[in-house]
Amino acid sequence: MASDPDNRSHVTNNQSNATRRGVSRRQYIAGAGAAGVAAFAGCSGGDGGDGSDGGSMGGDGTTTINIITWEEYAEMQENIESTLDGVELNITPSTSSTEMFSQWSSGQDEQYDIAVPNNNLVPRFMDADLVAPVNNDVVNNFGSMYDRFQSFVDNQFTESGNAYGVPIRFGWYGYSYDSRSVPDHEPSYDILFEDDYVDADLDGEIIMYDEAAKSIPAAALYLGMDDAMSGARMTFTEDQLSEIQELLIQQKPRLQGYIAPDPTFIQEFRQANFLVGHSGRNETVQMRSEGDDWVEFVAPREGALAWYETAVVSAASDNKETAWEVINEFITPQNGAALAEAGFSPSTNPNVADKLTEEQNELYGRIDPSRLEGMYSLKDIASDVEEAYVSTWEEVKAA
């Protein structure tokens, strides 16, 4: 049972067309309704319809690239098809990186050309020999990405000098707080674990993610175990896991509870059911875009936990070069801006800022690179301590 943080925020922007500035209707599929239509149209033929392999060649010379990915990627379909001559995208929407891996490992890698799982799943695809190395001659936008994501690739899924995935968009976890009740303070995980860190009574006013993959790393960073977070996988010792378990159990009397992300988090926060919440940035961006100017999100000084969606190409694809051409388009400024707007998540290409308004840039545009340096990428637990890791979380929840 390796960690799989699929329950991060994948929020679709349902703003009206009047407020969708900076990306034209002519260039992109406008609105969540059109995105859903395009996505589910792709779903109807995601496996080639007749069981054929992915990346089929049509009778008119059109190459169809079959993709399993998150719903918002349909926002780029129209523009990519108009940019790449003779290429048609067939998009199957998914809500789970684990689902993507399970499908490919059960034989559907022959039915898809591209998947876009969370970064922590890419090593599993690699270990199962399901993915092809990046074609650097084709993915010429790779060098335009933030340096931090290029280093994440080197650290997490590069073997024998070959990278096996391209980061597309990202987000990170820290905590949110209600600025009407919680005073300004230096961002720190201390607020989650120490009674007197701020001048506010937070007993029963804190929530944590109901997921080991997010709550255990938060406790680890508070305890200064950043070395265990720095490799390709989390490498806690059993003694460290025992210390983490003790901390999380001691914290429980301060908690309002454990909570799922996205709509549940937002609903509970708006109902004032907690004041401080371990959370992703996306939830706060959505709330602020909808008028909740009292909510603040911060990245703790000890380090934030970053996720990033990573495009991979099936080793079984008959159209690898075309698939990499499509992935290269995912991180162009125009397409990256459309995807950022659709899901409130920044592109790994900072040049998207040129395609967004000032207001959009504040929410999901260019990020100061220095802010990325203190982030640790989300990753699986090392196999030799996986059993102890799972047991740690089970003991915390049962206490």
Kindly give the residue locations of the regions a language model identified:
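Terminal disorder- and signal-encoded targeting elements
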Residues: 1-158, 162-167, 172, 179-203, ...
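Short, solvent-exposed positions on alpha-helices
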Residues: 321-324, 337
